[in-house]
């Protein structure tokens, strides 16, 4: 079973390498269990000859290596002076303005979902009810005398 699976996968790999024009190593594998020999087919090794092309260097390379001219380049500009100033501006605004002013803004945001206000209001009502001798909580949330129910039919 294992020899059959290995043989199938080896053939598939060799066929894929041959169709893509990749160099493939010839594989010969012998199983110690069943004396099965797995070797690539002779068809997989035959490839059409590659077309010959003349090698010509590009007279004007498109990508210019900035590190050859300025080894301390930060990648903002080709000019070393502008590159340093752009780097300083980015870090100043990134660190000073965004982090410092951003955290200050978040710290002074208003009460989210009014949690602090509801706590203060509950403490105020508890003090008022204790001072006037009223129960802290009533069983009825609404005054039953003010509720108007529909008449029975």
Curated annotation (Swiss-Prot):
Subcellular location, principal: mitochondrion
Entries under Pfam families matching the protein: ESSS
Membrane spanning stretches: 89-109
Transit peptide: 1-29
Domain of life per record: Eukaryota
Membrane topology per record: Single-pass membrane protein
Keywords tagged on the record: Electron transport, Membrane, Mitochondrion, Mitochondrion inner membrane, Respiratory chain, Transit peptide, Transmembrane, Transmembrane helix, Transport
Name listed for the protein in its UniProt record: NADH dehydrogenase [ubiquinone] 1 beta subcomplex subunit 11, mitochondrial
Native species: Pan troglodytes
Taxonomic placement: Eukaryota, Metazoa, Chordata, Craniata, Vertebrata
Gene that this sequence comes from: NDUFB11
